[in-house]
Amino acid sequence: MSTVSAYAATSATEPLTKTTITRRAVGPHDVAFDIHFAGICHSDIHTVKAEWGVPNYPVVPGHEIAGVVTEVGSEVTKYKVGDRVGVGCFVDSCRECDNCKAGLEQYCTGTGMVGTYNAIDRDGTPTHGGYSGAIVVDENYVLRIPDSLPLDAAAPLLCAGITTYSPLRHWNAGPGKKVAVIGLGGLGHVAVKLAKAMGADVTVLSQSLKKMEDGLRLGASAYYATSDPETFDKLAGSFDLILNTVSANLDLGAYLGLLKLDGALVELGLPEHPMEVPAFPLLAQRRNLTGSMIGGIPETQEMLDFCAEHDVRPEIEIITPDYINEAYERVLASDVRYRFVIDTASLRS
């Protein structure tokens, strides 16, 4: 066992504070690595503020983790000391259900996936995330970060990247397809870059035009304000695929009307309240309303390799751990373009 520095939440109302946590001893199949960078995901904030249920405090958030291997177990074959690696939203699953065997561990129907933080590991201890100096994870849930991807830019790909890559791949985004992205934030800006790299024609749908210049620079061919009622008339029946990256309650009927025959609107965010789904827009053009959650280990590795090949990198702002609480406030105020990444050097010393 080892003791490492970390930042933890102790309640829904208090700021995160520096503390120490214990990491398990490296087992035969484990990989230990020093964390160099950890992204801040809005899910971290939802969790520590108990908006998705009361967590098991203290909580060390962070499921966008990148670093360098320091030790491997005696049976490890995939990694060696010095390798550049990452960990995303989960660190284990049952490994026996059909979904796990298919490389869709995020949909595990056995134990359910074991979250990187605020979950219980196989040994009965709580999992703690990437706002820390080091971590120990089973090799089967560790990802290899390609040499051409900087570690700081790679970190957000382990949640924001795979959350958008998976539905783009599943619903066949590519040449000849028109993709719309609702929201240009942490998820949305990566979705635009990925869809463009896949060869799709990309449109951003945002409440206002204030990020229009960014959207076009990132790869969108068009940018529309959803606050303008004419937008929905103008774009009716235009898209093969729409990714909803925001957690706000939307008029689903209006957005479904933007889809072509057999088009799909994919929910990636988690609205606070249920949304009404009108039947007519679904029936009229055999449209689909569906959802997607992160991605399995094989697909996440595929995503990292794709991003390296196509030079897809999130737009990030690097911070130190003592700025985490201010960063949370800025995320809530939509004052980040487009992902905070914590440089954890001070937690490794």
From Swiss-Prot:
Keywords: Isopeptide bond, Metal-binding, NADP, Oxidoreductase, Ubl conjugation, Zinc. Zn(2+) 1 binds at residues 41, 63, 159. It catalyses: a primary alcohol + NADP(+) = an aldehyde + NADPH + H(+). Signal peptide: none annotated. Zn(2+) 2 binds at residues 94, 97, 100, 108. Disruption phenotype: Not essential for growth, strains missing one copy or both grow slower and have a different morphology than wild-type. PROSITE patterns: ADH_ZINC. Gene3D superfamilies: Medium-chain alcohol dehydrogenases, catalytic domain, NAD(P)-binding Rossmann-like Domain. It comes from the Bacteria. Its EC number is 1.1.1.2. Disulfide bonds: none annotated. There is a cross-link at residue 210 (Isoglutamyl lysine isopeptide (Lys-Gln) (interchain with Q-Cter in protein Pup)). SMART domains: PKS_ER. Prefers aldehydes over alcohols. Pupylation of this protein has been demonstrated, however it is unknown if the protein concerned is the product of this gene, of the identical gene adhC2 (AC P0CH37), or of both genes. This is NADP-dependent alcohol dehydrogenase C 1. It comes from Mycolicibacterium smegmatis (strain ATCC 700084 / mc(2)155) (Mycobacterium smegmatis). The lineage of its organism: Bacteria, Bacillati, Actinomycetota, Actinomycetes, Mycobacteriales.
